[in-house]
Protein backbone atom coordinates (compact mmCIF):
# COMPACT_ATOMS: atom_id res chain seq x y z
CA UNK A 1 0.00 0.00 0.00
CA UNK A 2 1.48 3.30 -1.07
CA UNK A 3 -0.14 6.01 1.04
CA UNK A 4 1.33 8.67 3.29
CA UNK A 5 -1.04 10.51 5.62
CA UNK A 6 -0.41 14.17 6.40
CA UNK A 7 0.29 15.78 9.77
CA UNK A 8 -1.40 13.93 12.66
CA UNK A 9 -3.41 11.58 10.46
CA UNK A 10 -3.17 7.80 10.81
CA UNK A 11 -4.22 5.00 8.42
CA UNK A 12 -5.74 2.03 10.27
CA UNK A 13 -6.98 -1.33 8.99
CA UNK A 14 -9.94 -2.47 11.07
CA UNK A 15 -9.28 -5.76 12.85
CA UNK A 16 -12.49 -7.78 12.76
CA UNK A 17 -13.27 -9.74 15.89
CA UNK A 18 -15.61 -12.68 16.08
CA UNK A 19 -18.70 -11.70 18.04
CA UNK A 20 -20.65 -14.30 19.99
CA UNK A 21 -23.95 -14.01 21.79
CA UNK A 22 -24.30 -15.01 25.44
CA UNK A 23 -25.45 -18.44 24.21
CA UNK A 24 -22.34 -18.92 22.07
CA UNK A 25 -23.96 -18.18 18.69
CA UNK A 26 -21.60 -16.42 16.27
CA UNK A 27 -23.09 -13.07 15.20
CA UNK A 28 -22.42 -11.83 11.68
CA UNK A 29 -23.35 -8.84 9.54
CA UNK A 30 -25.53 -6.21 11.17
CA UNK A 31 -26.04 -8.36 14.29
CA UNK A 32 -22.36 -7.98 15.19
CA UNK A 33 -20.94 -4.61 16.16
CA UNK A 34 -18.07 -3.26 14.09
CA UNK A 35 -14.75 -3.62 15.82
CA UNK A 36 -13.08 -0.50 17.17
CA UNK A 37 -9.67 -2.17 17.04
CA UNK A 38 -7.23 -2.02 14.20
CA UNK A 39 -3.64 -2.14 13.05
CA UNK A 40 -1.80 1.05 12.12
CA UNK A 41 -0.61 0.89 8.48
CA UNK A 42 0.84 4.41 8.10
CA UNK A 43 1.33 7.57 10.15
CA UNK A 44 1.89 11.23 9.33
CA UNK A 45 4.92 13.22 10.48
CA UNK A 46 3.12 14.72 13.47
CA UNK A 47 0.91 17.51 14.74
CA UNK A 48 2.06 21.02 13.87
CA UNK A 49 1.90 23.30 16.90
CA UNK A 50 1.10 27.03 16.71
CA UNK A 51 4.81 27.91 16.96
CA UNK A 52 5.59 25.67 13.96
CA UNK A 53 7.13 22.83 15.97
CA UNK A 54 6.16 19.33 14.81
CA UNK A 55 5.03 17.10 17.69
CA UNK A 56 5.72 13.44 16.73
CA UNK A 57 2.88 10.93 17.04
CA UNK A 58 2.69 8.35 19.84
CA UNK A 59 1.46 5.57 17.53
CA UNK A 60 3.66 3.80 15.01
CA UNK A 61 3.18 1.42 12.09
CA UNK A 62 2.25 -2.05 13.33
CA UNK A 63 0.61 -0.90 16.59
CA UNK A 64 -2.76 -2.45 17.45
CA UNK A 65 -5.03 0.38 18.58
CA UNK A 66 -8.48 1.01 20.00
CA UNK A 67 -10.17 3.97 18.33
CA UNK A 68 -13.32 6.04 18.62
CA UNK A 69 -15.86 5.30 15.90
CA UNK A 70 -17.71 8.14 14.26
CA UNK A 71 -16.92 11.79 13.62
CA UNK A 72 -13.42 12.32 12.31
CA UNK A 73 -12.98 8.73 11.14
CA UNK A 74 -13.28 8.33 7.36
CA UNK A 75 -13.44 5.01 5.51
CA UNK A 76 -11.53 4.78 2.23
CA UNK A 77 -10.83 1.94 -0.20
CA UNK A 78 -7.16 1.78 -1.18
CA UNK A 79 -5.71 -1.02 -3.31
CA UNK A 80 -8.96 -2.94 -2.80
CA UNK A 81 -8.56 -2.81 0.98
CA UNK A 82 -10.91 -0.86 3.23
CA UNK A 83 -8.97 1.38 5.61
CA UNK A 84 -9.79 4.11 8.09
CA UNK A 85 -8.23 7.57 7.98
CA UNK A 86 -8.31 9.30 11.35
CA UNK A 87 -6.55 11.83 13.51
CA UNK A 88 -4.32 10.47 16.26
CA UNK A 89 -6.80 12.17 18.64
CA UNK A 90 -9.38 9.54 17.60
CA UNK A 91 -7.13 6.77 18.94
CA UNK A 92 -7.89 6.04 22.58
CA UNK A 93 -5.30 3.36 23.37
CA UNK A 94 -2.42 1.26 22.07
CA UNK A 95 -2.93 -2.43 22.85
CA UNK A 96 0.13 -4.22 24.21
CA UNK A 97 -0.57 -7.75 22.95
CA UNK A 98 2.32 -9.22 24.98
CA UNK A 99 0.84 -7.95 28.26
CA UNK A 100 -2.61 -9.38 27.40
CA UNK A 101 -1.19 -12.88 26.84
CA UNK A 102 0.75 -12.94 30.12
Swiss-Prot record:
Pfam families according to UniProt: Cpn10
Location (main, coarse): cytoplasm
Stored InterPro entries: Chaperonin_GroES (IPR020818), Chaperonin_GroES_sf (IPR037124), Chaprnonin_Cpn10_CS (IPR018369), GroES-like_sf (IPR011032)
GO annotation, biological process: chaperone cofactor-dependent protein refolding
Cell location: Cytoplasm
One cellular component term from this protein's GO annotations in UniProt: cytoplasm
Chaperone among keywords: yes
Keywords recorded for this protein, A-Z: Chaperone, Cytoplasm
GO MF annotation list: ATP binding; metal ion binding; protein folding chaperone; protein-folding chaperone binding; unfolded protein binding
Superkingdom of origin organism: Bacteria
Family of this protein: Belongs to the GroES chaperonin family.
Function: Together with the chaperonin GroEL, plays an essential role in assisting protein folding. The GroEL-GroES system forms a nano-cage that allows encapsulation of the non-native substrate proteins and provides a physical environment optimized to promote and accelerate protein folding. GroES binds to the apical surface of the GroEL ring, thereby capping the opening of the GroEL channel.
Quaternary structure, from the entry: Heptamer of 7 subunits arranged in a ring. Interacts with the chaperonin GroEL.
Protein name, as recorded: Co-chaperonin GroES
Organism field: Vibrio harveyi
Organism placement in taxonomy: Bacteria, Pseudomonadati, Pseudomonadota, Gammaproteobacteria, Vibrionales
